[in-house]
């Protein structure tokens, strides 16, 4: 065998090295290369939306005395007090007198995205229906108002309407809300709102997802109750979150 190899090399001195290089080349092409740690191609807006939110304020009233007015809420008007049904404590606005009753809560959050979530329970009486509202950035900034009588939700900023959507209140059922103001590039602010029945999975789709050509100054969060039906309005699970820009 050795004689054959020696004879072959004498006759074709370059054939064996070329054969060896060909084997190495084929082996390199057929061997699976280790995966590269490449950066994600995730959409920048999706990546920003998934960034972690920080809790600024949270209250579920479970540790408060029934009949008390929570000290961490600034009541603008109305006889708001903690009430209880079975093992569930919540903040209640009485059904009488009828009027416009609001409150402020949480820290003044500025130069950040702001998210407010809460639960509410409102009940009609005959043909009379209640209304409620929530605000981001104080009483004069972004607000949505649910008018059960007209089956509409109106989104506004400083009393100027931004948009409206059809929405039918399910009387007697707890509802969850998520309301967000997301400052963008320049003076734009993205406003998002969704509502769903408490106990059900949060929907992915937003009822409102609008870009307002105004800068978001930030501030406190607010709630309002309008007991036009003469029945109590209940609020629970208040939570404010913020996210750095």
Question: What are the residue ranges of the model-derived segments?
Answer:
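Short, aromatic/His-centered strand-loop micro-motif at the edge of beta-sheets
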Residues: 156-178
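C-terminal motif of bacterial Sec signal peptides marking the signal peptidase cleavage site
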Residues: 27-28
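Extracellular beta-strand elements of beta-rich domains used
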Residues: 61, 236-240
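Short tryptophan-centered beta-strand motifs in secreted/extracellular beta-sheet-rich domains
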Residues: 61, 118, 173-184, 191-195
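Flexible glycan-contacting loops in extracellular carbohydrate-active proteins
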Residues: 202-234
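Extracellular glycan-recognition surfaces and repeat-rich motifs
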Residues: 65-90
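Extracellular carbohydrate-recognition regions
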Residues: 38-73
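Secretory/extracellular carbohydrate-interaction modules
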Residues: 86-157
